[in-house]
Structures are given as C-alpha cells and as structure tokens.
C-alpha cells in the first residue's frame, strides 16, 4: 500500500471514529441503554462521558486533515479506548447485570481503539516539526 492510499484510509478511520464519538455514543446510550448506559442511571455521569467523547471526536475530525502531524492524538484516542474497553469488560464480566455491555460499548471501544492504533503504527516515521537540532546520542553510534 502506498503512502497516499494509507493516508486516505487513515483519514477515513479518523472521520468515522470522530463521528461515532460525537454522535454515536450519545445516540446509542438513548436507543440501547442496556448495551451503552451503565446502571444505576446517572445523568450527570452520562453527560460528562458524552462531553469527553464528543470533544475527542471533534479533535479526531480535525486530525483527519493531517494524520501524520497528529500521531500522538490518534494513538492516545486508540490506546485510551482500548484501556477503557478492557476495564469495562472486566466490570461487565464481574457484574451479571452489566453483561449486555460485552456486546455493546465494550467491543465498540475495543474495535475503534485497535483500528486507530493499527492505522497509525506500521513503521512510519514520526514527523518532527522542530528546527532545533537534536543532540547526538553516543549510545546509538555504530562504528
């Protein structure tokens, strides 16, 4: 896959993930509370959760303009989604009243997280925008 095709896939993943975080989570919490809203219902918690993910979604949409220069944000979104999904998976397994989440928000976050990390990882160089020369590391010299 050439760089242009890869960047097109990255942009697509960022746009879809951003839109899911902005609109999908709030919508699914209303339409399918058993899979996306934890009990007991706490509107304050839900509003904070929706606000944080909507904000992340907006920044993922902005990152789609130039994925290479937003690598840290994309990796944060990916890894934090994986960690969040894993923690919720453990909680859902331990609490029988929350097991529906194992087919709801848990796999949704894990899938989005893995895909975000995958489209960001494979051996691509990190773009350095600083004009300040980096100090030489003697440990990395090859003689």
Task: Outline where the language-model segments fall.
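Membrane-water interface at the C-terminal end of transmembrane alpha helices
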Residues: 110-134, 143
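Membrane-helix boundary elements
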Residues: 6-44
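Hydrophobic core of alpha-helical transmembrane segments in multi-pass integral membrane proteins
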Residues: 18-29, 107-121
